[in-house]
Swiss-Prot record:
One GO-annotated biological process of the protein: translation
Polar residues compositional bias, start-end: 1-10
Subunit structure as annotated in this protein's UniProt entry: Part of the 30S ribosomal subunit. Forms a bridge to the 50S subunit in the 70S ribosome, contacting the 23S rRNA.
Matching PANTHER family: RIBOSOMAL PROTEIN S15, BACTERIAL AND ORGANELLAR, SMALL RIBOSOMAL SUBUNIT PROTEIN US15M
InterPro entries with a match to the protein in the record: Ribosomal_uS15, Ribosomal_uS15_bac-type, uS15_NS1_RNA-bd_sf
Keywords on record: Ribonucleoprotein, Ribosomal protein, RNA-binding, rRNA-binding
Annotated organism of origin: Nitrosomonas europaea (strain ATCC 19718 / CIP 103999 / KCTC 2705 / NBRC 14298)
HAMAP family noted in UniProt: Ribosomal_uS15_B (MF_01343_B)
Function summary: One of the primary rRNA binding proteins, it binds directly to 16S rRNA where it helps nucleate assembly of the platform of the 30S subunit by binding and bridging several RNA helices of the 16S rRNA. Forms an intersubunit bridge (bridge B4) with the 23S rRNA of the 50S subunit in the ribosome.
One protein family per Pfam: Ribosomal_S15
Disordered: annotated span: 1-22
Name of this chain's protein: Small ribosomal subunit protein uS15
Family: Belongs to the universal ribosomal protein uS15 family.
Length: 89
């Protein structure tokens, strides 16, 4: 199931740096993580959906690049974000 507008708005409110912030790396990574988690659930039921799997891999790659950027600019924010999203073990 796709991520709804309400879910996106909630994620933006939770991860924004200041009111109205929708473009910071933290918000973008959080939104991508929400979409990735939604697709992972989709693939549990639709194993042979290879076309969507390509989109998933593209999103994972984009999230990785944003995380690398955030790590190079603000390591403390990077560590807080991955802890909050539960991305690293």
């Amino acid at each position: 199931m796709a991520v709804t507008t309400d879910q996106k708005s909630q994620v933006m409110r939770d991860y924004q740096r200041a009111a109205g912030d929708t473009g910071s790396p933290e918000v973008q990574v959080a939104l991508l993580t929400t979409r990735i988690n939604s697709l992972v659930d989709h693939f549990k039921q639709h194993v042979k959906d290879h076309h969507s799997r390509r989109g998933l891999l593209r999103m994972v790659s984009r999230r990785r690049k944003l995380l690398d950027y955030l790590k190079s600019k603000n390591n403390d924010s990077y560590r807080a974000l991955i802890e909050r999203l539960g991305l690293r073990k």
